[in-house]
Amino acid sequence: MLLSVATATAYGLGVQSAPAEPAVSAPATSPAVKLTQAQIVERARAYMVQIGVDPDSENGRIIVAWFTRVAQNPDYLARLSSMRSLSADGSNMILPPAERLRFLRLMRDIANESGSGCEIPKVSGGNLASIAKTSSPKALRGTFELMDLIGERKGVSSGDDEHYTVAELLAVNARMDEIEVPPWLAKQSEPSTCALIRFAVDSLDKFPEPDQRRATYELFKLIAGGKSASETVLADPGAYLDDVFDDRRLPDAIRGQLPPDGSRPLPYARLSIDGEWVNKTTPRDSGPYVDTYVNRRNNGVVVELMTTKDASGNTNWASFGMGYGLTDLLDQTVRAPRYATPLRTLKTASAIVAANEPMTEGQRIEIALPQPSSHGQLTRRCDIGKTEPASTIFGTLTGNAVNLDCSEVRKDGTKTRVRSVWLADYGVELTRTIDDQDGRTDVVIKNVTVTQP
């Protein structure tokens, strides 16, 4: 929309030769218009008549006033036209934090003012005549204020000055995902862009710093066509696993309880499992997955990446984890297109001590879970069962498999039960069945690939 209006401005004032149809984009530069203010007003009014807008109507007067002001600012259109060449991540559109918040609030106001509101470009084809005829005066003023934030800015984009890690932006995504959706939005099966903007900006107004600054940065990337933090992670989940799920980044109280590097050797660098979930009660929970375990330092700590793909072969869900024995140290889930849970971290160092205890048949153990958990779970309770050869789980596995029957109780009282096996040779736990609110999910292992150190 910004470029359509910019083009119409240049054309209407005679700084472009008149095209048969309005141009798609503004000129690369905005030559100074050597006209008196009265001549500019005259041309602007004539242009209003040409596009079918009464120059004496309230919207006509708003546009004429804006035309007149812009024509006397030779850099204004050049800044707007620079928006044609957006960077891949949208950083060259990112305003300073206070102006980003002002921009988003204006978008919300425009959305609140009209049913089409922020979707005007789609509804009207983005041409100035349609915008002038369909917008309320308040919405039209808001539209020009939006353009002023871009056209009147000076200096480099804020995107050149602000640098956030993917983990920091993903944490903001997770915080936004935790906000309870209001009833007026929840009842919409496919919320409009305007509805989502209203909800997002109302939520952002309540964010403390630095989350508010990071959240507006993330939203501006999306507005400019860049990738969200969730999309960035799903495009290369292995990179995120390597960056964030590193035991050297654990809190000192937890890290200090772990064995030294090299003291707990495992016979692999990477263990990859191709499997399938089968749920006859809830078929949407069924499908193939890949579960990869990585042994980095032979200290008993194993990191895990489980992924699924969509019909196009793109990763659409990723579960990240770090464990030591039966104790989970870190975990996080990311789902397409823009969902993430907070990075959950073990807070109780005593859980490391429990992970060092031998597993004895008939024993019951209770292990603290990383927090904040997904549904208010605090601990996982496991009953230790019989030991059997690991080859009964999958033919190429070595050593023993200890059967486990574990459960977690959610805050609402519902329970998830997981039957699994502990593979002693590999230092990992493999799930066999899951019983939860969606019924029973059976896990079928299709293939196991071991990459040697």
Protein language model regions, located:
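N-terminal Sec/ER secretory leader and immediately downstream segment
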Residues: E21-I131, A235-D310
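Extracellular-facing segments of soluble proteins and assemblies that are Gly/Ser/Thr-biased and enriched
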Residues: C118-P121, W317-T379
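Signal peptide processing junction and immediate N-terminal pro/mature segment
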Residues: A8-S25
